[in-house]
């Protein structure tokens, strides 16, 4: 079996050291470097300030980011599976960890993703529940935008709980109805 060569940072990002700019070749968006320790502190602070709302805020941030990754890419001639591979390459090169499809099919009702070396919990230990809400949101946002419909993402295992990887279940779900729709007013 032939060895597949991963893209380098230069393949995925333009680094302009004179101007102090990093630009993604995938999304054409400007980016920045953010340390895992700083992320862990910010994540913990958001959870401390907003309590049970903290994880929801983090997931929504990821959701918006995931949708934007898909929206900004010209994929008119790109199959969904190829596009997912491009996103996986971006995650690896950005230092987020290695994401793989471990079971199922994201175009169907259910799929599982596994992330080894997840940056979002790499500096967080001893937790009793998963803490990668941002990454769950990225997966959900990208899936909603790429495959259509609405999805739910559940983090089933997390390195912050001493698991070997962060594993996510992606499920297609029924669209949420408004209060008026639920009452039959619309």
Roles of regions detected by a PLM:
Residues 1-133, 152, 157-186:
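N-terminal accessory segment detector
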Residues 132-148:
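Active-site helix/loop of acyl-thioester processing domains in fatty-acid/polyketide metabolism
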